[in-house]
């Protein structure tokens, strides 16, 4: 029992992290502001850069220094709310600054973990360590799936359930961060947030966050997911020798001894005689945000056991309500995965090989499983239509909200969006859908420029030339031709193949159609 207890222990921050005073420091708001400018490719908060100034930050800090201000705003929140209802800009500044503050202990933990990847005495970095650092890109998930999933049979496609109340998010954070003032501030912020019910009742993948407080609530949600996700890591590491008599060690760690008996009563009948079914060395777990995939080489019975385990574990020990329609068990041979803005599938391909043995010739058919990824064209067009680049049928339209910008700014924004989409979907097995998306953006840019000049697209391009747009829509093939200037055939072949990049940390905003 002591062995399992030590395995479940996490390196939480046992010391007191006095982070709350940082909310009154001006440089924290400057850091949050710089992060916000580099985050959005659509530049939805274009006015945020114009409104931000250190003078506004100083006035906000002065108001927060008033000891009675927070008390008055709490007692009279319906008449004079501190933020979130009447002053969205203050809410944006405070939430983004506070999210930067809350991430400091976790960033320090990451830095301490990366210390092992420093240069050795010979001045070289170990290759295994370097590969581990590159795995921070979400494109590394597809290279992993490409290598592993083609040999598996079943997949458990799960939308992670949401917590019943946001206070559960704060309690999960309490065991990682020992700072009572900061946690009280989190509770106050959630109380003032006027639309907090939508965060836990959305039907989308994971909580539905407002644009203003997105980073802050994603931080809370991810800290909660990591809390129970570490249990699954423990289960996977111990699966080779886990027996039914030791299953009670899988109790939720916050109340390690208090819930042992209750766990045994609830799940003993389901798992006591069949725990050997979890000793599956081909079980693979992948998660991004609110969606996870569990793939196995076992039978459908194995996947149903895992399904039953997840539902009971979430509901009994993390107070998460899981609905059956959020969990799907599918066979990989006839099902496509909708994951990370790609449609992924495993298809069986046959090839005929001519063999010769002595004087005899014969043909043999070899069947292999190939992992394919495609751009979901219909959801992508829906995202473009929602952002007013085209209509629902995919016909490009002008971007009306950008008409007041200069021509160079309009072209720069459209070109940046097209390049980012091309960069993110470089792993697609078929580039025709991606070419259609780029065509929609290019024609939408032309119509926006023509409308700003009160002209037609044909007349505008006749005056300025089509080269005006081509300059800002550099394709991946042209980029590769610069890398391989003497081998254009190599660059064309590389462009037609799937390419996974190691510098992508999040889903493209337009590609995130969930």
Curated annotation (Swiss-Prot):
The lineage of its organism: Eukaryota, Viridiplantae, Streptophyta, Embryophyta, Tracheophyta. It is found in: Plastid, Chloroplast. Belongs to the intron maturase 2 family. MatK subfamily. This is Maturase K. Usually encoded in the trnK tRNA gene intron. Probably assists in splicing its own and other chloroplast group II introns. Keywords: Chloroplast, mRNA processing, Plastid, RNA-binding, tRNA processing. It holds the Pfam family MatK_N. It comes from the Eukaryota. GO terms for cellular component: chloroplast. GO terms for molecular function: RNA binding. InterPro entries: Domain_X (IPR024937), Maturase_MatK (IPR002866), Maturase_MatK_N (IPR024942). One of its GO terms (biological process) is tRNA processing. The keyword Chloroplast applies. Its main location: plastid.
